[in-house]
Amino acid sequence: MLHTLHRSPWLTDFAALLRLLSEGDELLLLQDGVTAAVDGNRYLESLRNAPIKVYALNEDLIARGLIGQISNDIIPIDYTDFVRLTVKHSSQMAW
């Protein structure tokens, strides 16, 4: 399943998101959700322990001035990669 987090993790039921993640799921951080990718925050630590891959939309990282501040565990992607993820996963959950 593809999960997309478009809101700040501070304004989301992040614990519920973590409970619903399964091995093999993927999470895309976009819009204000990219703040979860900033190195050193508590949400990033939770994502590191999850059995998933985590991506962040590069355009949103740039728009928020976060390039250079995100963890190496997060994979920056562009819109083409976003489309590939949506094609890959038949089910999606938006947060």
Swiss-Prot record:
Identify the keywords attached in UniProt to this record, alphabetized.
Cytoplasm, tRNA processing
Any one Gene Ontology BP term: tRNA wobble position uridine thiolation
Q: Domain of life of the organism in this record? A: Bacteria
* Coiled coil region boundaries: none
The record's Pfam families line, in alphabetical order, gives: DsrH (PF04077)
Q: Cellular location of this protein?
A: Cytoplasm
What are the annotated GO cellular component locations? sulfurtransferase complex
Per UniProt, subunit arrangement is: Heterohexamer, formed by a dimer of trimers. The hexameric TusBCD complex contains 2 copies each of TusB, TusC and TusD. The TusBCD complex interacts with TusE.
Q: What function does this protein fulfil?
A: Part of a sulfur-relay system required for 2-thiolation of 5-methylaminomethyl-2-thiouridine (mnm(5)s(2)U) at tRNA wobble positions.
Q: Which family does it belong to?
A: Belongs to the DsrH/TusB family.
Q: Which HAMAP family match?
A: Thiourid_synth_B
Q: What name goes with this protein?
A: Protein TusB
Tell me what organism the protein belongs to. Answer: Shigella dysenteriae serotype 1 (strain Sd197)
